[in-house]
A protein has these predicted regions:
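Aromatic-anchored segments of alpha-helical transmembrane domains
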Residues: 35-45, 122-130, 185-194, 236-248, ...
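Hydrophobic cores of alpha-helical transmembrane segments in multi-pass inner/ER membrane proteins
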Residues: 6-15, 78-97, 152-164, 211-221, ...
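Membrane-interface helix caps and helix-loop-helix hairpins in membrane proteins
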Residues: 195-204, 223-226, 248-260
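Alpha-helical transmembrane segments and their cytosolic membrane-interface
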Residues: 108-192
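Membrane-interfacial loop-to-transmembrane alpha-helix junctions, especially the N-terminal start
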Residues: 23-33, 111-115, 171-183, 227-233, ...
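Membrane-interfacial, low-structure loops and terminal tails that flank and connect transmembrane helices
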Residues: 99-114, 392-412
């Protein structure tokens, strides 16, 4: 489990080392990542046992033919796939060392300091969702809504955001981008692990807002597309706020892998876009940001409304639960009512067309609530900007006033000095 964890850290480090000439990241790539890759080769037999086991979930839960499933866990295919990954993990550090002439400066204390800052942060950020359960078990401490663990997570979430901001705010833009990419790639990896750790079905598709955010956040950082970012930062913060207020938990032990998925995903979906704003990677949210968000959410809502209705109709027609969808929690009454009991009355207002079921009042309310909260959040951002600008102006005015006062004092001192000199000159002349 620890080796798989470290290999996930390589997944974050190596792409960043290619596109950023950051010495700390490249030092991790040519040392830590090479060591991990060699260890993976040495443990190939154990890897192959895991890859080809029919006892796991993930690939074995796919609704595909037995022949195709057998191909996916075929030892020869998995060995080739493993070899491709290993070659890539070794090729990148070799190219960095030879073509880029990158070598670790072992005599440089700053090099070591930055290395031991970067390495633990990368390892901690990239922890797979299943590793805590593997190492410690689920534990007897239950993570449930409004429990002390729930509030501890909220505290750590905002504490981590503050620590990252104050820890890196004075660093260069390159370092800030490296931090954001480490978090974004870790988020992407941790979400995709759900397909292997749990199952791959319609519910697991990245069409819930926070699941989609795992991809859009990375895309916005790569493309620097302001419209994608505007949509992502507002709508995903709204999504996380809803998740914090009404967490979708299963009442299992704290380290249960779905709990880890829930915590890791919603933490990074909030932290990465907010940090990007605070670091100045993207400009302030202007009047067009709300427009981009509302247009983007409307397109998203209509898309998941159509897809959710279609998939649930297929599930009803075939009797196969794998096709059930519950995007925005507005399709499956049992799940939504368990989380929010008063929605039962809204689900009771429905009609059918063939196998498709529609809940018009509930679905319109969901749309309206998201739009309202997005608007409120946007104006909260604007209010924060206004308060910050007033503080900056006040400090600037105070500094200017102090400079003027210092200048006046200097002039007065010069004047007094001049008068003293004149008096001394007069006294000397009188004595003569």
């Amino acid at each position: 489990a620890v080796l798989r964890w470290f290999s996930m850290a390589c997944f974050s480090v190596l792409p960043i080392a290619v596109f950023f000439k950051n010495r700390a990241v490249r030092n991790v790539a040519i040392t830590f990542c090479v060591a991990v890759t060699i260890a993976q080769i040495a443990c190939f037999a154990q890897y192959l046992d895991c890859f080809t086991s029919a006892a796991g979930k993930g690939l074995n839960s796919l609704p595909v033919s037995e022949g195709f499933r057998a191909f996916l866990i075929n030892p020869a295919f998995r060995a080739v796939w493993f070899a491709i990954i290993i070659v890539l993990q070794l090729t990148i550090p070799i190219i960095l060392a030879i073509n880029e002439n990158h070598l670790f400066k072992y005599n440089d204390k700053i090099e070591w300091r930055n290395y031991f800052i970067a390495l633990p942060l990368v390892i901690l950020a990239s922890i797979p969702v299943y590793v805590p359960q593997y190492l410690f078990g689920q534990t007897d401490v239950i993570l449930s809504a409004y429990s002390w663990l729930h509030f501890l997570w909220i505290f750590l979430l905002f504490g981590t955001l503050a620590a990252l901001y104050f820890g890196f705010r004075k660093q260069s833009s390159e370092v800030k981008m490296v931090v954001l990419f480490v978090l974004a790639l870790s988020l992407l990896m941790q979400y995709n692990q759900m397909f292997g750790a749990i199952s791959l079905n319609i519910k697991r598709l990245p069409l819930q807002l926070c699941n989609l955010g795992a991809y859009l956040i990375t895309l916005s950082l790569i493309t620097k597309n302001k419209k994608i970012f505007n949509f992502t930062v507002i709508i995903n913060v709204v999504g996380v706020l809803f998740a914090i207020a009404k967490p979708d938990l299963e009442g299992k032990g704290f380290f249960y892998y779905y709990n880890m998925h829930f915590i890791f995903e919603h933490s990074n979906v909030l932290i990465v876009p907010i940090l990007a704003l605070l670091f100045g990677i993207f400009p302030r949210l202007d009047k067009f940001a709300l427009r981009d968000c509302l247009i983007g959410f409307t397109i998203y809502f209509l898309s998941v409304f159509a897809l959710g209705t279609m998939f649930n109709a297929i599930a009803s027609a075939t009797g196969k639960g794998i096709y059930e969808a519950n995007f925005l929690f507005m399709f499956l009454p049992d799940v939504a009512i368990k989380m929010i009991p008063f929605t039962k009355a809204l689900f009771d207002i429905n009609f059918k067309i063939g196998y498709a079921t529609f809940y018009p009042i509930l679905q319109l309310i969901v749309y309206a609530i998201f739009i309202l909260v997005c608007v409120l959040l946007y104006y909260c951002f604007r209010l924060i900007y206004l308060i910050k600008d007033k503080i900056v102006l006040k400090r600037a005015a105070l500094a200017q006033s102090e400079n003027i006062q210092s200048g006046n004092n200097l002039i007065e001192n010069d004047g007094a000095s001049g008068e003293n000199n004149e008096e001394q000159s007069s006294e000397v002349e009188g004595e003569k």
